[in-house]
Structures are given as C-alpha cells and as structure tokens.
C-alpha cells in the first residue's frame, strides 16, 4: 500500500464501542471502523503484568514486543528494537504522528523515545528534537518544548520549538497556520496547538481555535502524500482514555465518535491504495452498558437511569483507582454516565 495509517485509542472494547455507537446514532447505527472488511480481537498484556498500562501497550504496538509497565520501550531484549516509524523511514516512506493529547504523551512517544519514566515529558521532548526525522508532528504539549521564560515548563532553558525550526521544520500554532502551510513544498511540520492536551470534542468554545482530530488527520495526509514512496501515519486518539479515566461518560463516547470521524476522513482522502488499521491499547474505567435502553434511544437518552431504575452506563473503577483494586457501588443519585466508583 502507498499509505499506511495506524489509529490507536484506549477503550475500544465491545462494551464501549456499543455504548458509543448507540450514543452516536442508536442501536442500528454503524461506525466507519466497524465497516472494515476485517475485524479482530487482540490481547494487550504487558511483559510482566496481565493488564498493560498506556506506555507499555503503545510500546508493544510500536516495536512488536511487549515491554514492562511504567516504562517506554524498555523491552526484554538487550538492544533497543526499531519502531514502525524507523522501519518505514528506512524503506523510504515519509512518516507522521498525530495526537489530540501531547506529542510527549506515552502513545506518541513510544514511536520515537525510550525511557524508564514515561512521565518525564521534558526528557521525552528532548529525544524528539535530538533524534527525530519524523516529517509531520501535530498535537499538543507546547509547554514541554518551551522554557519557563516563555510560559513553558522546561527547566533547562532550551527552546525546543526554535531548535526544531532551525532543523528545517515549519512551526504552526493554530488551525489557520496549519491549513496555510504550502503543501507543494512537502515541508517538515511541527504543529503545537495548545500548551497541554487539545480540547475535548465537547469543548466547543475552546476547540473553535484548535484543529480537531479529523482536521489533523486530513492535514497530515495532505502533507505526507507527496512522498513518492508513500508514508506511514500514526494517529493517537488519546482523549478517549483521558475522559474514561475521569469517568466522564458522555465525553468518552463523544471522543470515540470523534475517532470514527477521523477514520472516515482517512478512508476518504488516503485513496484506494491505503491500509488503515484501528487498534485498541487498553481499557480505562471499565465502562459497562446495562439493560434496557430502547432500540432507537441515542444521545442523552442512554446517559441516565432507564425505565427499570437501573443506570444505563456504569463504571467498574473510578478516578484514583490506581491506589485500589476494590470497586465500590454506584450512586444512583448521579447521572450514571458521570458516576464514579472510586474509594
């Protein structure tokens, strides 16, 4: 294939996909990603633990070998394994990373960085600048590239954005600048559209000044398609996992729908000679769909208590669940999609 586009997201479980599908259009609705000719289930255990964390799951996808939890690509093998992006570059392909979280977040970083601390965002940003030959980088996380004197959080005083400009990258900070980039030059582009992660799909006022995930995917395709040997684009739809970790039910479902819109963009604009893969990493929050919503229910109709007095959606674990493995009950006094189950 000329184009290879890999979408990654947390919470692509049957329960969450079913909930998001019903929310988006009812029980008979189908997501674009559900129309693919091939569907499969996959396991995501880490090297030691039966349940993977985000960094280990992303590292497994990036290299094909399961690393340890709480590390970024520290595999069992003694030598670092090449990532999919590195292999793509060696074959002459252009490469890109798109994320609606930060470019230094674990999923995006798994494709270019290697560290024992996936939360050391400043060091990860440095690895991106010092070793990256990635053609297109679009997402959030500008604070990890700027010194404190420029409202960033780098304590070493380095302006990594300036360093990337000196390496030949076009720097874009908003949607207008991104869409004004001359495509015919096939430039290297670093787009940083917020100091932290990008806005959620339901944050209309904030997101109006930022590109959405479908916007980012379209721009990346337009930039990468000029390479005569094709390209590999990795898309991290990370906000679904961020929302789920906070038990934000409707927000989680809207982020899954946003991912599907980005998949639809890829299918439309990548051309017929394209391989598009959508893969889940791990599940956060344990969202469950209970009975019995009606077949035509959609949107807010599935967010509260159903006719039997049972929450349509419940969570297995809630914010702070990293400190406990004991689930607690759901409070029926709250809208179930927003109820927490943390201790």
Q: For the regions a protein language model found, what residue spans apply to each?
A:
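Mobile, glycine-rich extracellular loop/lid and propeptide segments
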Residues: 1-19, 61-62, 66-69, 75, ...
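A post-motif C-terminal structural segment
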Residues: 2-4, 12-18, 22-59, 105-343
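A short, structure-level motif marking secondary-structure boundaries and short turns
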Residues: 68-71, 144-146
């Amino acid at each position: 294939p000329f184009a290879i586009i890999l979408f990654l997201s947390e919470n692509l479980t049957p329960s969450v996909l079913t909930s998001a599908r019903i929310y988006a259009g009812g029980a008979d609705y189908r997501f674009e990603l559900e129309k693919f000719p091939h569907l499969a289930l996959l396991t995501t255990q880490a090297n030691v633990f039966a349940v993977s964390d985000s960094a280990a799951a992303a590292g497994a996808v990036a290299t094909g070998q399961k690393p340890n939890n709480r590390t970024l690509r520290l595999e069992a093998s003694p030598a670092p394994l090449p990532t999919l992006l590195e292999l793509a570059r060696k074959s002459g392909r252009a490469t890109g990373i798109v994320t609606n979280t930060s470019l230094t977040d674990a999923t995006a970083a798994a494709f270019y960085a290697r560290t024992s601390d996936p939360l050391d965002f400043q060091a990860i940003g440095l690895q991106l600048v010092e070793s990256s030959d990635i053609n297109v980088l679009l997402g959030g996380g500008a604070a990890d590239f700027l010194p404190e004197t420029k409202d960033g959080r780098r304590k070493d005083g380095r302006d990594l954005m300036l360093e990337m400009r000196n390496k030949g990258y076009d720097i874009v900070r908003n949607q207008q600048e991104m869409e004004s980039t001359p495509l015919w030059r096939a430039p290297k582009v670093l787009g940083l559209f917020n100091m932290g992660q990008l806005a959620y799909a339901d944050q209309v006022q904030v997101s109006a000044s930022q590109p959405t995930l479908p916007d980012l995917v379209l721009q990346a395709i337009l930039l990468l398609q000029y390479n005569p040997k094709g390209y590999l684009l990795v898309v991290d739809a990370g906000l679904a996992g961020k929302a789920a970790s906070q038990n934000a039910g409707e927000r989680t479902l809207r982020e899954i729908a946003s991912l599907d819109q980005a998949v639809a963009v890829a299918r439309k604009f990548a051309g017929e000679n394209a391989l598009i893969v959508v893969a889940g990493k791990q599940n956060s929050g344990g969202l469950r769909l209970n009975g019995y919503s009606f077949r035509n229910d959609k949107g807010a109709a599935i967010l509260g208590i159903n006719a039997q007095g049972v929450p349509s959606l419940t969570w297995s674990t809630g914010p702070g669940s990293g400190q406990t493995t004991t689930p607690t009950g759901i409070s029926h006094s709250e809208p179930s999609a927003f109820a927490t189950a943390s201790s």
